[in-house]
């Protein structure tokens, strides 16, 4: 199920992203080329998948979440462009291709990331992509701004940069990853639910529990793959976190215990969906996929 669902959602979000990434003037061709390169060069599209699945959990057509799906993928892509810069993680490979600052240059990569961040909010406010009432679109903008900013993803990256060579306990490690990785994953689910225009507060609360567990599980599995996989499969440098002496779940818990923890988080996510019917099956499948994926 998950492969067909993933392919369908990837095609949908890519089609919605395409018009946003067209240069409006000849003078902006290189900037937009860097932006397109950063977004349209593959990727699992996990965050759009979660947005679409959360929308569908309420029986609402997935297309209602096109704006949400585009927005979270654009924010994710911008974060990768900036994370890969020499001043940050200094990576030269992403999704099996040279990172944006290697394919273009550092200044262009910085501007491309800035542009992608701005486009995310354009997508949420575009009535063609986000046909919801103004009050819902405002709530969606607030959700994404909170998740992407210093109280969310950006704050998590700041903590991450300050954690190199530092031995964090599990509570501190999870605080970092709930911000760096988890905040945008939680926002993806919430944005999809808001896009449905049918979610009540109790359902939003249940989905937050689901998304928080899935967000941590995603990071635990990433850390496991950094140990067990290879560069060709991952599309990025294998062992990079170990080489930089970054805190990881396998380093803290041991590999077997990290795998067990990922399974516990998956089960927590599935339990949070107990009040949802079969429309939430894609969310259930995604929770399983996130801890079973090999890249």
Regions flagged by a language model, labelled:
Residues 1-22:
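N-terminal amphipathic/basic leader segments beginning at the initiator methionine
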Residues 21, 25-271, 281-291:
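Mg2+-dependent prenyl diphosphate-binding active-site environment of isoprenoid biosynthetic enzymes
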